[in-house]
């Protein structure tokens, strides 16, 4: 592999912000998370789009996105298809936290935060770069 390509790929992997064409940013922290079985783990998401609705999704290898929680505004939490084993918190319009209440042994997954805006009859979701969780 060319050293410039390697440097570019490395830089992309270390970036925790996803910038979208209209200048908005979704930041997920941490980028990588290693935990132990039974541990409570918290993931954070910030957006500066001024979007009302935010989401947390889980994506396991070989599977599509599964909705964990979403929030239409501050202090409003709606359970998704996969909310068992998770808690969420949204005290400000710009931030949405997700807590894995009890990490499962050998769990390896990616969590994705998104925010959305509805224009006319279409809704566009803007995604963060993801948090990769590994449980030992």
Swiss-Prot record:
Alphabetized InterPro entries for the sequence: Ig-like_dom, Ig-like_dom_sf, Ig-like_fold, Ig_sub, Ig_V-set, TCR_beta_variable
Range of residues in the leader sequence: 1-21
CDD domains found in the cross-reference section: IgV_TCR_beta (cd05899)
Protein's GO biological process: adaptive immune response; cell surface receptor signaling pathway
Keyword terms of this UniProt record: Adaptive immunity, Disulfide bond, Immunity, Immunoglobulin domain, Receptor, Signal, T cell receptor
Disulfide bonds, paired cysteine numbers: 45-113
Spans annotated as V segment: 22-116
Keyword Signal set for record: yes
One Pfam family in the UniProt entry: V-set
Region of interest called J segment, as start-end residue ranges on this chain: 121-136
Region (D segment): 117-120
Entries under SUPFAM superfamilies matching the protein: Immunoglobulin
Keyword Disulfide bond part of the UniProt annotation: yes
Entry's Gene Ontology cellular component terms: plasma membrane; T cell receptor complex
Note from the entry: This sequence was derived from a T-helper clone.
Name of the featured protein: T-cell receptor beta chain V region LB2
Organism of this sequence: Mus musculus
Lineage, opening ranks: Eukaryota, Metazoa, Chordata, Craniata, Vertebrata
């Amino acid at each position: 592999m060319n050293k410039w390509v390697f440097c570019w790929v490395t830089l992309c992997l270390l970036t925790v912000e996803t910038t979208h064409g209209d200048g908005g940013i979704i930041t997920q922290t941490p980028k990588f998370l290693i935990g132990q079985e039974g541990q409570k783990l918290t993931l954070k998401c910030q957006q500066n789009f001024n979007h009302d609705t935010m989401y947390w999704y889980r994506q396991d290898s070989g599977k599509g996105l599964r909705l964990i929680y979403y929030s239409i505004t501050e202090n409003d939490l709606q359970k998704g298809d996969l909310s068992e084993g998770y808690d969420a918190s949204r005290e400000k319009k710009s931030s949405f936290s997700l807590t894995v209440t009890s990490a499962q042994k050998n769990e390896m997954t990616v969590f994705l935060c998104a925010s959305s805006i509805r224009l006319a009859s279409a809704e566009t979701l803007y995604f963060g770069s993801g948090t990769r969780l590994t449980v030992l």
